[in-house]
Amino acid sequence: RLPKGHRLRVAISTAYWPLLWPTPKAAPVVLTAGTLTLPKRPLTKHSDEWHFEPAETSTPLKATQIKPAHHIRRNEVDQRTGLVSLIIEDDFGTSHIDDHGLISGSTARERWDIHPDNPISAKGHAHWTQTNARDNGWAVRTEALCGMHADEQSFHLWAEMSAFETNPDGKEEQVFHEHQNWSVPRDFM
């Protein structure tokens, strides 16, 4: 409920970067006078608040934390060029799963760039690392990278996947690698 005397602010934008990819050209917006009609929530029997039953859940996974998670969200503006970047760095930590001994960890790095005056400058890049190991020396790691940019006609994407396994002698060896590129027509997007 909106308390008496409070106001709602309606924000209208032609961009929702980086959640939605921008159109190839800046889109104009023309607003004329209008109204906003919001539904009124009916009162319940005892109050004007909703109450829900507790959620059903399974037994939590029993794990021992080896390295805590750490997350960074950072915006950067290149003062020379005006390029705006969103940098996301997620270290999800490392845990030992007590029931079966798997040691698991992962990190994710993302970068989303755009120049505010040039929607076609948008580009994104992500790099995910997943590690799994056991106390007996067995270990595997995957590296997944992908990126995207666009021109006025097409979206251009690339992806790369690599997998590594640690040999019994302790040496890590690449056991898989693939790289692909695609171009997809924008079809007025």
Where do the protein language model's features map onto the residues?
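Glycine/threonine-rich phosphate-binding loop and adjacent beta-strand/alpha-helix elements that clamp
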Residues: 1-189
